[in-house]
Amino acid sequence: MSSQQTDNNPIPTTTTNNNTNNDNDIASTNNNTNNDDDSTTTNTSTNKPRKRFVIPSASQALKKSDLSMVEINSKLKQAEENAKQAEDLQKSNAIILTPKSTTTMTTTTTPVQQRMPIPSILAKRNVNTTTTTSTSPLSTSPPISSPLQTPYYSPSFVKNPTSPAPINKPIGPSLPMRPSLPKKPAAYSTTLSTYSSSSSSYSSSTTTQNYQHIDKIYANSKQRGSLMMNSFSKNIIIEYSELQYPDFILNSNTLVFYLPSLKTHRDNPNLIQDRIKGLSTLMTNSDSFTLRILLVFADLSDSDNCEQFINELNLIAIKLQFTLIVCWSQIEAAKYLEAYKTFNNRAPDPIKARAQPIELGGKSKNEQVLTSIKSVNKTDATTLLKNFQTMQQIFTCQKTTLSKLPGFGPVKVQKFYNTINQPFKTKPSTKTTTTTTTTTTTTTSANISSNNNNNNINTNDGNNNNNTINNINFNNDENEVDQDPLNFSFDFGGNGNGDGDSDGDGESENQINT
């Protein structure tokens, strides 16, 4: 509204204004005098005075808590317009379809689809690529200054793909690759040697390869076509590579040396040992393989000294810190490798020993050692630990001290004493029988067994010259050996005549207690 008013002129000047009222739609010509606080309105068309009212200022209008319906509707319309503008702005950055061309009914036209990148999605993608690519000007659009910050992916008339794009494959010609799944642990760097057939020489080269694929086993190319390679399940992927020394690499910390036959070790005993020693010379990070497996296929029988060759390989594996696994078929060898690959990331809790706590009745380490001896239970182990201060005193005690403990009878004392005093390695004992007579005696040992109850020597006849010992039972419990040679005939139960008859009944008693 425009008005002109002069303070010096007493006669007010009138101006003609056109005002539109949204409620009553009445147009009037008013002569208005505007002040900051009060406003006076006069109507020039009619001489009738009107009711005087005060027009509130902008600050007073904002202080009012209740607004009129007109103001509310205007604000809602303004918000809708802002939202529509923001939506149109995002639609311009989304997938745009060109309109169909108007053709006749006989011809068919297909829409030309042009995919354009979305700024909100590209901001979240951090893909490291080695090659330099040129970015399109649409990929870096200015930020959207609108109240709606949710990204608009595609209009309602565009059909989204039913299945997602495969991993590590580009979505379109102008978009980068999708980020691959996280792999744990990371890639493994190693230096391998490659063989050149033209120059007949080896050359070392550093290659970075990720051995942590979920279902992939890296095999030596020499294993191609073997029966074991055809025995893996369909879930395992075999990738052949030029590995000179290890035959298989299961992951970044597990490698396998495979001996396909014991006959190879029999003909060349140093072959597998030289291959294992050559591993550290070609692979810079060979120490990172914490699990090293020596897989052996035993194809020899017992008559061909199969056990002897396995013992030799076991000593080689212990010296070189390898784990020896013996299989009896190539299918079984494939199952072992597949099991190692399948249970690679599994926790070892199912195969760990679950020791019961001592508070709940479990055994301590000292009790486990003592109860490993036969006839010693947990109560006896507790008694020994209470009466002796250290384990050294327990293993150096005497029979008299053990017999004083509660629960230790003569038999238990003797068994425990024999166990803690016997050597770790026993040599086969050769016993000979001698007599005081001038005639030589022939002894034939048929069966030797250890018995803790009785000592029996059974002879076939009563002749002291030819005694055949059929059963010898050694006892260390109650009886002692009589070393007096004069009582030899009496100990045999004889009467001095050499017939073995002690009571004169004509029968020979062939029993001796030593």
UniProtKB/Swiss-Prot annotation:
Structure-specific DNA repair endonuclease responsible for the 5'-incision during DNA repair. It comes from Dictyostelium discoideum (Social amoeba). This is DNA excision repair protein ERCC-1. CDD domains: ERCC1_C-like. SUPFAM superfamilies: Restriction endonuclease-like, RuvA domain 2-like. It is found in: Nucleus. Residues 1-47, 429-476 have a biased composition (Low complexity). Heterodimer composed of ercc1 and xpf/errc4. Residues 1-52, 426-514 are annotated as: Disordered. GO terms for biological process: double-strand break repair; mitotic recombination; nucleotide-excision repair; UV-damage excision repair. Its main location: nucleus. Pfam families: Rad10. GO terms for cellular component: ERCC4-ERCC1 complex; nucleotide-excision repair factor 1 complex. Keywords: DNA damage, DNA repair, DNA-binding, Endonuclease, Hydrolase, Nuclease, Nucleus. Signal peptide: none annotated. Belongs to the ERCC1/RAD10/SWI10 family. The keyword Ribosomal protein does not apply. InterPro entries: ERCC1-like_central_dom, ERCC1/RAD10/SWI10, Restrct_endonuc-II-like, RuvA_2-like. One of its GO terms (molecular function) is single-stranded DNA binding.
